[in-house]
Amino acid sequence: MIRIGHGFDVHAFGQDRPLMICGVAVPYHTGFIAHSDGDVALHALSDALIGAAALGDIGKLFPDTDMQYKNADSRKLLIEAYRQVQATGYVVGNVDVTIIAQAPKMRPYIDQMRQVIADDLNCDISCVNVKATTTEKLGFTGRGEGIACEAVALLIKPALCSSYRNI
């Protein structure tokens, strides 16, 4: 059996902290305004995984009203979300993350981002794709006010998929 989940997140720039994207500190003059570390990519990916497993959403698992998640490392949130997904009997088939940002440029960090996600999801890097695009200077991302991210996750229940082979 397979399941597909979609996640979306957005954060505005404006806080004096590192800019974390896919668990990587991307050099930039500002960080995100957020309750946690604001990693839009890992939040979108966590939401995609949680949604695919029908476990609700990231706000249900990690509410921003709970002080234990204040300045939380989003890698830890992703790992915990995936632990809960695995408890349902599913594993990652593949994930695809799209970062939507006018700046900073993501290209130099994409391989590192893929590796971080593969490590956190305990899967082969070939199961992880990260890409970046702009909105051609349109909207809030185009004006450089923040970053948006979408993610899709395919989950597989290995016991029910005889053709599945964890690479």
From Swiss-Prot:
Site positions per UniProt: Transition state stabilizer: 35, 134
Coiled-coil stretches noted in the UniProt entry, renumbered to this chain: none
Gene: ispF
Substrates-to-products reaction catalysed: 4-CDP-2-C-methyl-D-erythritol 2-phosphate = 2-C-methyl-D-erythritol 2,4-cyclic diphosphate + CMP
Keywords recorded for this protein, A-Z: Isoprene biosynthesis, Lyase, Metal-binding
Cofactor(s) needed by this chain: a divalent metal cation
Family membership: Belongs to the IspF family.
Pathway(s) it belongs to: Isoprenoid biosynthesis; isopentenyl diphosphate biosynthesis via DXP pathway; isopentenyl diphosphate from 1-deoxy-D-xylulose 5-phosphate: step 4/6
GO BP term, pick one: isopentenyl diphosphate biosynthetic process, methylerythritol 4-phosphate pathway
CDD domains to which the protein is assigned, alphabetical: MECDP_synthase
InterPro entries, A to Z: MECDP_synthase (IPR003526), MECDP_synthase_CS (IPR020555), MECDP_synthase_sf (IPR036571)
Name used for this protein in its record: 2-C-methyl-D-erythritol 2,4-cyclodiphosphate synthase
Binding site for a divalent metal cation: 9, 11, 43
UniProt function note: Involved in the biosynthesis of isopentenyl diphosphate (IPP) and dimethylallyl diphosphate (DMAPP), two major building blocks of isoprenoid compounds. Catalyzes the conversion of 4-diphosphocytidyl-2-C-methyl-D-erythritol 2-phosphate (CDP-ME2P) to 2-C-methyl-D-erythritol 2,4-cyclodiphosphate (ME-CPP) with a corresponding release of cytidine 5-monophosphate (CMP).
GO terms for MF: 2-C-methyl-D-erythritol 2,4-cyclodiphosphate synthase activity; metal ion binding
Subunit architecture: Homotrimer.
Domain of life: Bacteria
Native source organism of the sequence: Glaesserella parasuis serovar 5 (strain SH0165) (Haemophilus parasuis)
Protein EC: 4.6.1.12
Binding-site positions, 4-CDP-2-C-methyl-D-erythritol 2-phosphate: 9-11, 35-36, 57-59, 62-66, 133-136, 140, 143
Note accompanying the cofactor annotation: Binds 1 divalent metal cation per subunit.
PANTHER family registered for this protein in UniProt: 2-C-METHYL-D-ERYTHRITOL 2,4-CYCLODIPHOSPHATE SYNTHASE, CHLOROPLASTIC
Pfam families to which the protein is assigned, alphabetical: YgbB (PF02542)
